[in-house]
Amino acid sequence: MAKLGLKKLLVTLASISGIGKPCVAHVLVVIFLEYFAWGLLTMPMIATLKETFPDHTFLMNGLVMGVKGILSFLSAPLIGALSDIYGRKLLLLMTVTFTCLPIPMMTIDNWWFFAISAISGILGVSFSVVFAYVADVTTKEERTKSYGLVSATFAASLVIAPAMGNLIMELYGINTVVLIATLVSTSNVIFVLLAVPESLPRKVRSSGLSWKQADPFLALLRVCSDPNILLLCIVVFTFLLPEAGEYSSVPAYLKLSMGFGFVELSMLVAFMAILSISANVSLGSIVKIIGAKKSILLGLFLELLQLILYAVGDEKWQMWLAGNVAALSSITFPAVSAYVSLYSDGESQGAVQGMITGMSGLCNGLGPAVFGIVFYLSDMDLNEDRLLNRSVNEDRTAAGPFMFGAISVFIGILLASYIPDEKTARGSKEEFSALKYIIEMDEEVPTS
């Protein structure tokens, strides 16, 4: 009875009509508020992480983020499939709630905060529902641009949030930052509940759930069905694995190992966000000038450069340079999506994009864990005083995770050089369509 009552309550909440017709702007607000709330906690989380795990800071940071990422990867297809059955609004309400659930725990108990942060990955996958919402309300021609707006909004939320969170923390303490972040996240839940209209009409919803829809590994297994897509997905894996590891560990590394203050770190994050937005906005022009394949290679070279700078740099200006190059290298994944959108037809594009997204989800789980373990093996899980008192020559073990990432990206560059060029890829649309048939029908392409 309680289960039925909860289901009825959720369906009732999801049936609230919202404001206006469903459009991309609705989910842009959701994404901005969600990551603005977490952006406020960037500096407080580093302080809390250091306080809670003083001797294993990098390892525990990697494991917490790794568990969260892996759980998100495992649950994302199920969440997407459920949104096809029950509608986008209900699942968006659930995922936004679970994404923000750990925030107030930071003032209650640090251990519970990190534990719930890790477990929240099960339902904290709002991006998958957001992209489905965007697909509902846009045409195929508008979709790529709209996805870019979602990514740019995510970056925009980080322009001022970390600096603002740090300023509030210094003036009023961590608890005040957590309170404000909680209020922002709560307002986001209320916005979804009252303002976001349903984008998927009942008449076009799925009638049931199959294991194929919920299996996170199915799309990855189907990668082997086409050599070009297999190559593309391996390239994605080689650069997204270290990118995800960096995203989870670099702020703590700069603070605890390189001596960055919270203010300086906030400024760097804001500047990187602005550069990333600019680079992604310019991607369309870059692709038109040099082509999608060369845009991928450009992004990979930039990522290789910034990883080497992090590995060999021992001065703050080198870390600033590495951060700026890292922001510019953020064009790589959108360039891969542009390659797929340009050189596959509309019917096969969704299947191939799904594979690449699945690979991205896998890297978001493995990357932080791998970097955390390599930091630990490199003897970097020390307290802040010991780290800052070590000499530069003594601490070259810090290069370990970044050199690992650089080697991975270098392999990606070698493989990316074999990606079919524009003319060859344009001639492969029938192969892309055949791949879509294999994925969806789970059988070989019929022959005449």
Provide a role label for each language-model segment:
Residues 45, 125-138, 331-345:
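Intracellular juxtamembrane helix-capping segments at the cytosolic ends
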Residues 74-108:
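Conserved MFS/SLC helix-loop-helix module at the cytosolic interface between two early adjacent transmembrane helices
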Residues 90-104, 182, 294-309:
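Structural signature of the two symmetry-related core transmembrane helices
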Residues 2-21, 197-233, 256, 432-444:
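Juxtamembrane intracellular "pre-TM" segments in multi-pass secondary transporters
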Residues 44-58, 248-265:
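Short amphipathic helix-loop junctions that connect adjacent transmembrane helices
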Residues 32, 102, 112-125, 317-331:
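Hydrophobic core of transmembrane alpha-helices in multi-pass small-molecule transporters
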Residues 75-87, 279-292, 375:
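Helix-to-loop junctions at the C-terminal end of transmembrane segments
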Residues 116-155:
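Cytoplasmic helix-loop-helix junction between adjacent transmembrane helices
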